[in-house]
């Protein structure tokens, strides 16, 4: 049996991933499909945590630019991530995977508060944990949430599951047919090149805590499992210097 490359991962999903072809809102069949992909990996014995963005329901930055108070806009976005987390948790439960939602803002009626020790215990017991409501403070992205929670739970890697994007390029491949895809980068290279994989805070956190980052196409069935079992798909960002350097 092939040994997995990673035994504990944090999967970062964009909110748009839950919207399907609609692009906005939540498409339940799409969520159920993603849940089945995650279940297949979970059934291989991998410990899994999730962070889901809220962009399918709310965008804080344009609301702020339109005149809304930035702090209030960000808190609204955090609530959007909770909605997405609850929907995904329900889909995973129906797929037969014991799942817990933990929020950085207290809302005991719908989710557990984020407690690191409890999250670790859930993972050790084979439960999936979904971290929602960001870090509980405005001005921090769900990318930063992913890097912070991955460090706290000592994840081996953050899997950046993208919609239709199969890795990191030196230019936008949709606009430049000659754009070059990177198979591997270091965190420092990402920061120096200004590649917009995550925001700089999240990239620095990942680098400082030696957490691999894998960017891959979520829309191709089986890709989550392929990444975890070490197949070369997408782009892997590590703290180590590439052999080609």
Curated annotation (Swiss-Prot):
Residues that hold UMP according to the record: 54, 74, 135-142
GO molecular function, one term: ATP binding
Annotated residues for binding of ATP: 12-15, 55, 59, 163, 169, 172
CDD domains xrefs: AAK_UMPK-PyrH-Ec (cd04254)
SUPFAM superfamilies, per the entry: Carbamate kinase-like (SSF53633)
Enzyme Commission no: 2.7.4.22
Family, as annotated: Belongs to the UMP kinase family.
Descriptive protein name: Uridylate kinase
UniProt keyword list: Allosteric enzyme, ATP-binding, Cytoplasm, Kinase, Nucleotide-binding, Pyrimidine biosynthesis, Transferase
Native source species: Streptococcus mutans serotype c (strain ATCC 700610 / UA159)
InterPro entries named in the record: AceGlu_kinase-like_sf (IPR036393), Asp/Glu/Uridylate_kinase (IPR001048), Uridylate_kinase (IPR011817), Uridylate_kinase_bac (IPR015963)
Localization per Swiss-Prot or TrEMBL: Cytoplasm
Activity regulation, per record: Allosterically activated by GTP. Inhibited by UTP.
Reaction(s) the record says it catalyses: UMP + ATP = UDP + ADP
Keyword Translocase belongs to the record: no
Transmembrane segments: none
């Amino acid at each position: 049996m092939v040994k997995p490359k990673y035994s504990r991962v944090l999967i970062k999903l964009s909110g748009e991933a839950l919207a399907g072809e609609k692009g906005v809102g939540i498409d339940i069949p799409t969520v159920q499909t993603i849940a089945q992909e995650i279940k297949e990996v979970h059934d291989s014995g991998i410990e899994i945590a999730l962070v889901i963005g809220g962009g399918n329901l709310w965008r804080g930055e344009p609301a702020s630019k339109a005149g809304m108070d930035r702090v209030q806009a960000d808190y609204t976005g955090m609530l959007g991530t909770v909605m997405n987390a609850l929907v995904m948790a329900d889909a995973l439960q129906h797929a037969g995977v014991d799942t817990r939602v933990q929020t950085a803002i207290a809302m005991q009626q719908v989710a557990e508060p984020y407690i690191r020790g409890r999250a670790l215990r859930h993972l050790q017991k084979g439960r999936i944990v979904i971290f929602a409501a960001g870090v509980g403070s405005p001005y921090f992205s769900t990318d930063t949430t992913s890097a912070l929670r991955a460090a706290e739970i000592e994840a081996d890697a953050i899997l950046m599951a993208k919609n239709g994007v199969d890795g990191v390029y030196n230019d936008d491949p949709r606009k430049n047919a000659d754009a070059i895809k990177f198979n591997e980068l270091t965190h420092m290279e990402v920061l120096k090149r200004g590649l917009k994989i995550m925001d700089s805070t999240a990239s620095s956190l990942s680098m400082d805590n030696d957490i691999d980052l894998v960017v891959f196409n979520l829309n191709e069935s089986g890709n989550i499992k392929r990444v975890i079992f070490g197949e070369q798909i997408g782009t892997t960002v590590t703290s180590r210097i590439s052999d080609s350097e």
